[in-house]
Structures are given as structure tokens and as C-alpha cells.
């Protein structure tokens, strides 16, 4: 009985299992058929849309249903990637291969930490894509309503040669996805050849639109008006060229400019009748000797300090600080959201730009001191080379005796074999943090000032020959890299008027010229040192020694021919020294430079005003004679009081450092609105005033401030042969900057630099002076239009907000 019951139970179980298996097979077969029909319908819709975009004639007839077995006989739609073949030349066809069209924006979790994407990350689709996409919504623009809207809008159409606007066909970033039978739905990146077929300048992207309150509160309106006045004050002081460089010289062929065959050629120019004289620390220029009214007036010191105090009162106003703090946070979050929805598109656009990547886009070292422009290993090799090849060269006069190079090292009890990088001791270490005095001592190789005088000075017994040879080697390294440029700071101290001629003679006689290099003049703010030494008697003497030779050579180039040639390569004036030194805030009624005879150093703002006022007048005079102009680009905001940044806001085109902007949301927001260039040096700051992880550079970048990376002092800071790339690489690694971020920073550095209009046209595009995506050429900058359009749109919205929608945004950048 038991055996019969067991047999019946086994038969029943077998029949039940068979029925279940048959049912499962049937349901599986039916599901596959439905999926295949849905895939074929998507495929037909996709081909139909492609035909509408690519063909001139529209075909409105629906495709008839096709059997699954006949799908391989369909004509190949235009624009599809080439057929991949196997080893024997047979096409590889996956029976389950389909192309699924997803929405433009998917609410997926980003694969890299917000706000950035790793520079080395590949693009992958999320594994948790929505499998149930409605057919009528598969290509619709996405609208995410979360305190605003996000819409997918194409970039404006291309303009034809006749000025007509041509519509640009939408090339949505559809990534090919193959169902290869993997149970986990593994997806593959697009084939490189397919990516390169895309036109990167035609990509669509998701725009961020946050609808603000229609009517701001009275407090906000008042704050906006105050900020608007601050911007107007800056515009009142700024020197702008009457004719923009792109209007003087129209570039039709942005090919590689021919190098200057004779950069030191002196062309005779006629002396003009201009007359100038120093009045209360500012040079007044008259059309002739008999004229009574000056022709290039500039705001006086009382007006400047009054306006600066107004800026300082604005910085301290609580309601304005609140408004600016909120706007800055909103700018940062907008960029984070932009990366969440557009980072993949930006990277694909970069991949679609042939030849360009971070390594071969132009990048300018916008802040580097000439005396420290080489790395420590380079300096060590050079010293050993000279000690081996020229030991008997007389190089210095000390204690009434002329010494050869060999005798100098014997007096130090050193040989060439003894020298190493550690003994050279020029690299900054922990002992230099908050010790600017110790940092300056690092300019002395082996701790010996005589070695600095021999190798790192141009006004020495050998007339700076060693430094000139070392400089040429650095120039050679830059030219070999091709894509790296530098703006070297070289010092004029103001102790005597002949310094300018000595400097120009050293440059011209040693033929120090490179297409990759321009010069800035740095003025150390050490009046108190010269006054205590008795070299000068008043601050007026310092100004006379610095500016009178410049006006003389401008009026009559024949009076200083070498200086005239040298000034053609000078693009900026810098103020340098330790900003952390305590100082008294200047008042509205300060003593004139002639009255400043005490031994105390004037405040930073005092230096800035008198350098600005004389430089403004000089530029007006030089522009009237068709000569190059010089911009004020001081060190500012590395340490010290916020007054420094307020004074620079009114007077300076760009500044170096600016880390103290993090202490003032109002001033930071004003620097953003004015797009004042910040040449920041995080590694240098890390050795002196602020740890790397606390540096505000990444925050400034997210918020849209005009920031670039620079090296400052490669001799003391960096370890490699390419210090600028080292600066970028460390920033990219620690702050997770993407390739797009790095290229945007490099593009900013070219804008901030003082290189010529012709070179900038070749480096970043011939329309670089236009705002927005019209001024961007991804084939030159490797920065996608998506990023440039986002930055411009957000900045434009902020400007319209500050001006209460009553502002005319210029189509070109500031001159």
C-alpha cells in the first residue's frame, strides 16, 4: 500500500513539474516576443527620425510590420557606425542586439563624488536604468522641477558667412548599448571612432533654470543697488584701451604666427612735444611745455581713499553680507547640479574633439618669479657645470678682493662633488610656514648670499651672465614643451633711476627672448629698508626712480633705446612683499609722497594708489603714441588685511593669490561679477600661509570666479622639470578635477595673461574675445561649449539680478 501511494505521489509530482516547466517556457517565449516587437518599433522610430534629420525629403509613411527573421535585410540607416566583423570577415550579429533610446537626463547616482568627475574616469551608463520607458516619451526633453526647472535645449545655431542663422540638427548624446546576453546587463562605452564622428560644438545639454521670486524684498533691492555702485566705482578707475586689440588687428588666418626674426630691433621714433612733471606723487602730462591743463586726468588720492572706505563699509554691512553669501552658495550648488546632469556630455564632447587634450592645450604660468623660475635640480646641475667648465672666471668682489668661482667655493669649503640638492637648501620646508623672512632666505643657495649674487642676480660683477645663460635654458625647456608659457616677474627696486637701463641692457645684450615668455615688473614694497639705509629720503624719491624713466622713454624713445625695446615685452606691473606685516589703515587725507619722510613703510593701499595713478597716466600716453600698455597686476590677498583686496578691486586688472577672499563674501561676489583674474598658487600657499586642503581654490572654481593655477616659486616649491604641470596634477588629484575642469583653468590662464592678440587668437580661437560659446573653440581649448555656455549664462543671470534686469551685457570681454 505504501509503495503504491509513493508511486502515485511521484507520478503526480512529475506531471506537476512538467506542467510548470511548460508554462514557464511558454511565458518566457511570449515575453521575448513582446520585447522583440517593442525593440523593432523603437528601431523603426529611430531610423525614421534619422531620415527626417539627414534627408531633405520627409517620408511620412509608416514602416510596415516586419518579421523577426527579415530584420537583417533592412537597409542600413545613414549615420550608423561601421559594421564590426569577425576574424573571417563575417559580420558579428547578436540576435538579442537592440538599441534602446533613453531620456536625456536620468536621475541616477553619479559615479564620482560631486562636484567633480575624475580626470581619468570613463563614461559608463548606470546599471539601474529604467527598463519601462514609454514610447512617446523616450526622447522628450527632461524637466526636473525641484526649486526650478531643467530643460534640454540645443545650443544656438551656427551663423553662416552671410550672417544668417542656420538651424543645427540635434545630435543627442545617445550611447550605444548592447544586450550581449549578460544577466547583469553589462554595457559598453562607445567605440572611439563613433565618438569622433560627432560634432562637439552641436551637443545639447540640460540647462539649469531656477525661477526666482518676481519681486525681491526691499532689503535685497537696496543690497543690489549698493553692489551695482561698487561695480561702477571699479569701472571709473579701470584703464580701458580706446581701441580694443581685436579691432586694431583683425585675424583672418589664425595659423601659427611667424616668430619675430629680430625682437630687439630698434625702430627710430620721433620725439613728441609732451611735457610732464611730478605733482603730489602723480605725474601730470601736458601737450607741450606752455600748456596749463593736463591731458590725462586721474582721480586724486583723497577721492580714491574715500571710495575705498565706501567699499570697506559695504563689506561690513550685515544685510549685504547675507545676500552675497546666499548668492555664492547658490552659484556653487548650480555648478554641482550642472555636473550631475552634464558631466558625461562634457567628457564625450572632449572625446569628440580630435587631437586636443589637457597636455596640448595652451596653459600660461601667470605668476612666477624669474629668480626662482628653475627647479632646484636644474640650478644644481648649472652650478656644477660652471664650476667644472669655468673655475677661473672672476665672479665677485668681496672684502677688497676679486675672487674666482673656484676660490668662492674653496672659501665655503665646498667642492663640486660635495654639492647635492639637500646641501643646496633652496627648497621650502616646514620651517617657512608663516615665516616669510625664512622663505626669502631660501633664495640663497647653500645659505650663502654670495652664491645668490653670482648665479641669481643680473647686476653683479659678471653683468648677470650666469643668470642669463640659466634663463635661456629655462626658455629652451618651455619651447620644447610648446604648450606651456610663462610670465616672469623681474624686480625694479626704485633705489635709483638707472635700474631701468641696467635691466633693459641685460635683457637686450643677452638676447633674452622667447615666444613663450613675456615679462612683468615687480616692485618690492620695502621703502622702509631704503629709508633706513639712507638710499632715499622720501617716498617721492621711490616714485621718481620708478616712473620718470618710463615717461622719458615714452616721450622720446631715443633717450633710452634699449629700454624702449624691452618695454615692448613688458605686459604688467606687480607689487610684492610680505602682506602679513601689520600696517595702519590709510585715511582720506594722507600725507603726500613728498611729505612721507619717516622710516615707516606706507600701507599697501598707499602703494597701490600711486602706482595705479602713474601707470594709468603712462598707459594713456603710450596708447596715444601707438605703444604697448602695461597693466597693474599686484600680489594681493595672500595674507594681511582685507583692505588690500578692496584697493585692488578698484584698480587692478588681475591679482596674484587672493586666498583672503574667502573671508569676505561681499568682496568675493564682487570679484566674481567683475571676473577679476586670480592667479592662485596652492602649493606656494601651502608652504607659507595656508594648508593645501584649506585652500579656497576649488570653492572659487565651483562658484565661477576667474581662477588660474600658477607656480610662484618653482625653485622653492616644485620638484619636477615641468612645475606648471606638477601644479595642475596635484590639484587634479587632491581636488578630483576632471579633464574639462583642467582645460577650463588653462583657458582662464590664457585670458589672464598679457600675450598678444595674435597669439591668443592662435591658442584659443580667433573669436576668443566674444563672451559665451561664440568665443570658444573646442578644437583649440578642449573646453566643451556646454561648460562655457553654462558659465556665461549663470554670470549673465547674476549681472541682470544685480542691475534689476536693467543692464546691457556687452558681447565682448573687457579690454
Swiss-Prot record:
<feature type="binding site">
    <location>
        <position position="635"/>
    </location>
    <ligand>
        <name>Zn(2+)</name>
    </ligand>
</feature>
<feature type="region of interest" description="Disordered">
    <location>
        <begin position="53"/>
        <end position="116"/>
    </location>
</feature>
<feature type="binding site">
    <location>
        <position position="369"/>
    </location>
    <ligand>
        <name>Zn(2+)</name>
    </ligand>
</feature>
<feature type="binding site">
    <location>
        <position position="638"/>
    </location>
    <ligand>
        <name>substrate</name>
    </ligand>
</feature>
<keyword id="KW-1133">Transmembrane helix</keyword>
<feature type="binding site">
    <location>
        <position position="367"/>
    </location>
    <ligand>
        <name>Zn(2+)</name>
    </ligand>
</feature>
<feature type="binding site">
    <location>
        <begin position="713"/>
        <end position="716"/>
    </location>
    <ligand>
        <name>substrate</name>
    </ligand>
</feature>
<dbReference type="GO" id="GO:0032264">
    <property type="term" value="P:IMP salvage"/>
</dbReference>
<keyword id="KW-0812">Transmembrane</keyword>
<feature type="compositionally biased region" description="Low complexity">
    <location>
        <begin position="105"/>
        <end position="116"/>
    </location>
</feature>
<feature type="compositionally biased region" description="Polar residues">
    <location>
        <begin position="159"/>
        <end position="173"/>
    </location>
</feature>
<feature type="active site" description="Proton acceptor">
    <location>
        <position position="657"/>
    </location>
</feature>
<dbReference type="GO" id="GO:0006188">
    <property type="term" value="P:IMP biosynthetic process"/>
</dbReference>
<dbReference type="GO" id="GO:0003876">
    <property type="term" value="F:AMP deaminase activity"/>
</dbReference>
<dbReference type="InterPro" id="IPR006650">
    <property type="entry name" value="A/AMP_deam_AS"/>
</dbReference>
<protein>
    <recommendedName>
        <fullName>Probable AMP deaminase</fullName>
        <ecNumber>3.5.4.6</ecNumber>
    </recommendedName>
</protein>
<comment type="pathway">
    <text>Purine metabolism; IMP biosynthesis via salvage pathway; IMP from AMP: step 1/1.</text>
</comment>
<feature type="binding site">
    <location>
        <begin position="438"/>
        <end position="443"/>
    </location>
    <ligand>
        <name>substrate</name>
    </ligand>
</feature>
<keyword id="KW-0479">Metal-binding</keyword>
<feature type="transmembrane region" description="Helical">
    <location>
        <begin position="5"/>
        <end position="27"/>
    </location>
</feature>
<keyword id="KW-0472">Membrane</keyword>
<feature type="region of interest" description="Disordered">
    <location>
        <begin position="144"/>
        <end position="173"/>
    </location>
</feature>
<feature type="binding site">
    <location>
        <position position="369"/>
    </location>
    <ligand>
        <name>substrate</name>
    </ligand>
</feature>
<comment type="subunit">
    <text>Homodimer.</text>
</comment>
<dbReference type="InterPro" id="IPR006329">
    <property type="entry name" value="AMPD"/>
</dbReference>
<dbReference type="Pfam" id="PF19326">
    <property type="entry name" value="AMP_deaminase"/>
</dbReference>
<dbReference type="InterPro" id="IPR032466">
    <property type="entry name" value="Metal_Hydrolase"/>
</dbReference>
<comment type="function">
    <text>AMP deaminase plays a critical role in energy metabolism.</text>
</comment>
<keyword id="KW-0546">Nucleotide metabolism</keyword>
<dbReference type="GO" id="GO:0016020">
    <property type="term" value="C:membrane"/>
</dbReference>
<dbReference type="GO" id="GO:0046872">
    <property type="term" value="F:metal ion binding"/>
</dbReference>
<dbReference type="GO" id="GO:0005829">
    <property type="term" value="C:cytosol"/>
</dbReference>
<comment type="similarity">
    <text>Belongs to the metallo-dependent hydrolases superfamily. Adenosine and AMP deaminases family.</text>
</comment>
<feature type="binding site">
    <location>
        <position position="712"/>
    </location>
    <ligand>
        <name>Zn(2+)</name>
    </ligand>
</feature>
<dbReference type="GO" id="GO:0046033">
    <property type="term" value="P:AMP metabolic process"/>
</dbReference>
<keyword id="KW-0862">Zinc</keyword>
<keyword id="KW-0378">Hydrolase</keyword>
Amino acid at each position: 500500500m505504501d509503495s503504491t501511494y509513493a508511486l502515485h505521489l511521484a507520478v503526480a509530482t512529475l506531471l506537476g513539474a512538467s506542467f510548470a516547466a511548460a508554462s514557464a517556457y511558454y511565458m518566457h517565449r511570449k515575453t521575448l516576443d513582446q520585447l522583440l516587437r517593442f525593440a523593432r518599433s523603437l528601431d523603426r522610430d529611430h531610423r525614421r527620425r534619422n531620415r527626417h534629420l539627414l534627408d531633405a525629403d520627409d517620408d511620412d509613411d509608416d514602416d510596415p510590420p516586419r518579421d523577426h527573421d527579415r530584420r537583417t535585410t533592412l537597409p542600413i540607416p545613414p549615420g550608423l557606425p561601421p559594421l564590426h566583423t569577425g576574424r573571417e570577415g563575417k559580420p558579428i550579429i547578436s540576435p538579442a542586439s537592440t538599441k534602446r533610446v533613453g531620456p536625456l537626463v536620468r536621475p541616477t547616482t553619479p559615479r564620482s563624488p560631486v562636484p567633480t568627475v575624475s580626470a581619468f574616469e570613463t563614461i559608463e551608463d548606470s546599471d539601474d536604468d529604467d527598463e519601462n520607458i514609454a514610447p512617446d516619451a523616450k526622447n522628450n526633453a527632461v524637466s526636473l522641477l525641484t526649486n526650478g526647472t531643467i530643460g534640454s535645449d540645443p545650443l544656438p545655431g551656427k551663423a553662416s558667412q552671410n550672417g544668417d542663422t542656420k538651424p543645427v540638427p540635434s545630435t543627442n548624446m545617445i550611447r550605444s548599448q548592447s544586450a550581449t546576453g549578460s544577466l547583469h546587463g553589462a554595457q559598453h562605452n562607445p567605440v572611439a571612432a563613433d565618438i569622433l564622428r560627432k560634432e562637439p560644438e552641436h551637443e545639447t545639454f540640460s540647462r539649469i533654470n531656477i525661477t526666482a521670486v518676481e519681486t525681491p524684498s526691499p532689503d535685497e533691492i537696496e543690497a543690489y543697488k549698493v553692489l551695482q555702485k561698487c561695480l561702477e566705482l571699479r569701472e571709473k578707475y579701470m584703464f580701458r584701451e580706446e581701441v580694443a586689440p581685436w579691432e586694431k588687428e583683425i585675424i583672418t588666418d589664425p595659423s601659427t604666427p611667424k616668430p619675430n626674426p629680430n625682437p630687439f630691433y630698434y625702430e627710430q621714433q620721433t620725439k613728441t612735444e609732451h611735457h610732464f612733471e611730478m605733482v603730489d606723487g602723480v605725474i601730470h602730462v601736458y601737450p607741450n611745455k606752455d600748456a596749463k591743463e593736463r591731458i590725462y586726468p586721474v582721480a586724486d588720492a583723497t577721492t580714491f581713499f574715500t571710495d575705498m572706505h565706501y567699499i570697506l563699509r559695504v563689506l561690513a554691512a550685515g544685510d549685504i553680507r547675507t545676500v552675497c553669501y546666499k548668492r555664492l552658495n547658490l552659484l556653487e550648488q548650480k555648478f554641482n547640479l550642472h555636473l550631475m546632469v552634464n558631466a558625461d556630455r562634457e567628457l564625450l564632447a572632449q572625446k569628440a574633439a580630435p587631437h586636443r587634450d589637457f597636455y596640448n592645450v595652451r596653459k600660461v604660468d601667470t605668476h612666477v618669479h624669474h629668480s626662482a623660475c628653475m627647479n632646484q635640480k636644474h640650478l644644481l646641475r648649472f652650478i656644477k657645470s660652471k664650476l667644472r667648465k669655468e673655475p677661473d672666471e672672476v665672479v665677485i668682489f668681496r672684502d677688497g678682493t676679486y675672487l674666482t668661482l673656484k676660490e668662492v667655493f674653496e672659501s665655503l669649503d665646498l667642492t663640486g662633488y660635495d654639492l647635492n640638492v639637500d646641501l643646496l637648501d633652496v627648497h621650502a620646508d616646514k620651517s617657512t610656514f608663516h615665516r616669510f623672512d625664512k622663505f626669502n632666505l631660501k633664495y640663497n643657495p647653500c645659505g650663502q648670499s654670495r652664491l645668490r649674487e653670482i648665479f641669481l642676480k643680473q647686476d653683479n660683477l659678471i653683468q648677470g651672465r650666469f643668470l642669463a645663460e640659466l634663463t635661456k635654458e629655462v626658455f629652451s625647456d618651455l619651447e620644447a614643451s610648446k604648450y606651456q608659457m610663462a610670465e616672469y616677474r623681474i624686480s625694479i627696486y626704485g633705489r635709483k633711476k638707472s635700474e631701468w637701463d641696467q635691466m633693459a641692457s641685460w635683457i637686450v645684450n643677452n638676447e633674452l627672448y622667447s615666444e613663450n615668455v613675456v615679462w612683468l615688473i615687480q616692485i618690492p614694497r620695502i621703502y622702509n629698508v631704503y629709508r633706513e639705509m639712507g638710499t632715499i629720503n622720501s617716498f617721492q624719491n621711490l616714485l621718481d626712480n620708478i616712473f620718470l624713466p618710463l615717461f622719458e622713454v615714452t616721450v622720446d624713445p631715443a633717450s633710452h633705446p634699449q629700454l624702449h625695446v624691452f618695454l615692448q615685452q613688458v605686459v604688467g606691473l606687480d607689487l610684492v612683499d610680505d602682506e602679513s606685516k601689520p600696517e595702519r589703515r590709510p585715511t582720506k587725507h594722507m600725507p603726500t609722497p613728498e611729505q612721507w619722510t619717516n622710516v615707516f613703510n606706507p600701507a599697501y593701499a598707499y602703494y597701490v594708489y600711486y602706482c595705479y595713478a602713474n601707470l594709468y597716466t603712462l598707459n594713456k600716453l603710450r596708447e596715444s603714441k601707438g605703444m604697448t600698455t602695461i597693466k597693474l597686476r599686484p600680489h594681493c590677498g595672500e595674507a594681511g588685511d582685507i583692505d588690500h583686496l578692496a584697493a585692488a578691486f578698484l584698480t587692478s586688472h588681475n591679482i596674484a593669490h587672493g586666498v583672503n577672499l574667502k573671508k569676505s563674501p561681499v568682496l568675493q561676489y564682487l570679484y566674481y561679477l567683475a571676473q577679476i583674474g586670480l592667479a592662485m598658487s596652492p602649493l606656494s600657499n601651502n608652504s607659507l600661509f595656508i594648508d593645501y586642503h584649506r585652500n579656497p581654490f576649488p570653492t572659487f572654481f565651483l562658484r565661477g570666479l576667474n581662477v588660474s593655477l600658477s607656480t610662484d616659486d618653482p625653485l622653492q616649491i616644485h620638484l619636477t622639470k615641468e612645475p606648471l604641470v606638477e601644479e595642475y596634477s596635484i590639484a587634479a588629484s587632491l581636488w578630483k578635477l576632471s579633464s574639462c575642469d583642467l582645460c577650463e583653468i588653462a583657458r582662464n590662464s590664457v585670458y589672464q595673461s598679457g600675450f598678444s592678440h595674435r597669439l591668443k587668437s592662435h591658442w584659443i580661437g580667433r573669436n576668443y574675445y566674444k563672451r559665451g560659446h561664440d568665443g570658444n573653440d573646442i578644437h583649440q581649448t578642449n573646453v566643451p561649449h556646454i561648460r562655457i555656455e553654462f558659465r556665461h549664462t549663470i554670470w549673465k543671470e547674476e549681472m541682470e539680478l544685480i542691475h534689476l534686469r536693467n543692464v546691457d551685457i556687452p558681447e565682448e570681454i573687457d579690454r
